[in-house]
Amino acid sequence: MVCIPCIVIPVLLWIYKKFLEPYIYPLVSPFVSRIWPKKAIQESNDTNKGKVNFKGADMNGLPTKGPTEICDKKKD
């Protein structure tokens, strides 16, 4: 059985997005833009900026020491 909030909350969000947001958003957006001003994203022309040397680190960024073993099966 599904709980009441699991049904009611998505329906209320859909009603808000479909019917209320088009009227409320134009009223609220000037205040929000004053609180959180957008800053321009500056693009750099440096081609080496995105490249990182991964020597000595595994894929999740943690340093590796010696061989790592990955087992997919349980050992009894």
Swiss-Prot record:
Region (Disordered): 46-76
Presence of the UniProt keyword Metal-binding in the record: no
GO cellular component, one term: endoplasmic reticulum
Pfam family, one: DUF4512
Alphabetical list of InterPro entries matching this protein: UPF0729_C18orf32-like (IPR026776)
Keywords, in A-Z order: Endoplasmic reticulum, Lipid droplet
BP-aspect Gene Ontology terms: positive regulation of canonical NF-kappaB signal transduction
Region listing for Necessary for its localzation to the endoplasmic reticulum and lipid droplets, in residue ranges: 1-37
Posttranslational modification: Undergoes ER-associated degradation (ERAD).
Location(s) in or outside the cell: Endoplasmic reticulum; Lipid droplet
Disease: Glycosylphosphatidylinositol biosynthesis defect 25: An autosomal recessive disorder with onset in early infancy and characterized by global developmental delay with almost no milestone achievement, brain anomalies, hypotonia, and contractures. Death may occur in early childhood.
PANTHER family: UPF0729 PROTEIN C18ORF32
Its biological purpose: May activate the NF-kappa-B signaling pathway.
Subunit composition and interactions: Interacts with DERL1 and AMFR.
Family membership: Belongs to the UPF0729 family.
Protein name: UPF0729 protein C18orf32
Native source species: Homo sapiens (Human)
